[in-house]
């Protein structure tokens, strides 16, 4: 049986990317709502209920409305908004998070696709907290830079409309109340919200997230090699992982660490740097904010859910 897939919000940034990734596939049938009917709740309900799997690429409130329009027990959902990421009954769509997560996604009725900003720090921190190398109440700070596509259509139009006058970068989220904090705290196994400082750069897509660690106040200070080993061991045990861990090495800089390096892929590459004498470490993730951070993750989750249908 060919699975029917409906992308609710297929004309937005993430929706367009998902459709492009699925366009040549013959194992699925893509349902497409006429443009003039895409904001009609009755039309959306028709397509949502006809789908085997619906992928929601909508703002939070619109995503909640779409879920409410599903009137059967068979349509499964992948939601790319923040609406359900820490909600009971929704599997978190980061298959590499735990050995059992791929199976949980494959069997789930409802899957919450991860946000681009939390996914890198979660990938870096969760193995360390699970291994007991970092306490859950460790004061975590997260820095990073993303392409302007991370702000959706309005930011894309604003940046590209300014041409040469567009800023090279700018910080945002200066109220320190980023919408991804609950998700980050929950899945990184943290006991408190981290301090998160995102930056937008003058490039379309790709991102780097960084977690600096001041380790000197811990009762037992882990060495850099220990941090790296815990992260590497975690992902070595995940079948089909899209997360790579770079070798542990002492380098001043690397041409690999470039935000656009993994654009149009679903790859995330993790790095650990350390100065043991100073009891400091830097954790770093490089990935595509529209790939592993959005559409690539959605397709990865879709494939897992399809495996549960076969």
Curated annotation (Swiss-Prot):
Active site: 116
Compartments (UniProt record): Cytoplasm
Chief place of localization: cytoplasm
Group of enzyme by EC: oxidoreductase
GO CC terms in record: cytoplasm
UniProt keyword list: Amino-acid biosynthesis, Arginine biosynthesis, Cytoplasm, NADP, Oxidoreductase
Pfam families: Semialdhyde_dh, Semialdhyde_dhC_1
EC numbers on record: 1.2.1.38
Biological role stated in the UniProt entry: Catalyzes the NADPH-dependent reduction of N-acetyl-5-glutamyl phosphate to yield N-acetyl-L-glutamate 5-semialdehyde.
Entry's family note: Belongs to the NAGSA dehydrogenase family. Type 2 subfamily.
Name of the molecule in the record: N-acetyl-gamma-glutamyl-phosphate reductase
Species of origin: Chelativorans sp. (strain BNC1)
Species classification: Bacteria, Pseudomonadati, Pseudomonadota, Alphaproteobacteria, Hyphomicrobiales
Gene name per UniProt: argC
